[in-house]
Design a protein with these regions (language model features):
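Long, hydrophobic N-terminal alpha-helical segment
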Residues: 1-26
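Short, glycine/acidic-enriched capping/hinge loops at junctions between secondary-structure elements
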Residues: 1-4, 30-33, 92
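Short C-terminal domain-edge/linker segments immediately following a structured domain
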Residues: 18-25, 49-53, 110-115
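N-terminal beta-loop-helix "entrance" segment that forms/cooperates
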Residues: 26-39
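Short, hinge-like loop/turn segments at secondary-structure boundaries
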Residues: 36-40, 97-100
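A glycine-rich helix N-cap at a beta->alpha junction
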Residues: 38-71
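A charged, amphipathic interaction segment
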Residues: 61-112, 118
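Short hydrophobic/aromatic patches at helix-to-coil boundaries
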Residues: 120-123
Length: 123
């Protein structure tokens, strides 16, 4: 998540339109009460959580998840939450953070939003 948010906020700071698409487990990063902290860190860090990686990043003086998300919010990065993912996880919209303006949509919405001259990155 850190690199996706860092890349999104950097691109938005350069006045490039950015859309972040959150689906399945990644949607939990947008739940209230820091749901991202409990997400698995990934295959390269077995047993670690997003919170563990965030502590490691901030311990090195790097921006943490909350700071990067705040930058994305400030730069008006568009956040698209997968409608199918919400249903699959049994999450209600009321469980998502109030400070993130998001739209619900799906893969078609995301692809339609991507400009012809833009780039789609999967991290």
């Amino acid at each position: 998540m850190h690199y996706a948010l860092a890349m999104a906020s950097a691109a938005a700071a350069m006045n490039k339109p950015v859309t972040l698409f959150f689906t399945m487990a990644a949607i939990r990063a947008l739940t209230k009460h820091g749901g991202w902290r409990e997400l698995p860190a990934g295959d390269l860090s077995p047993g670690e959580t997003g919170g563990d990686q965030d502590s490691a990043m901030t311990g090195k003086g790097l921006a943490g998840f909350e700071e990067l998300l705040e930058a994305c919010i400030a730069f008006k990065v568009k956040v698209l939450v997968c409608e199918m993912g919400l249903h699959a996880l049994g999450l209600a919209k009321s469980e998502l953070r109030d400070d993130v303006a998001y739209e619900e949509g799906g893969i078609v919405s995301f692809l339609a939003d991507a400009s012809a001259g833009g780039a789609t990155l999967f991290i």
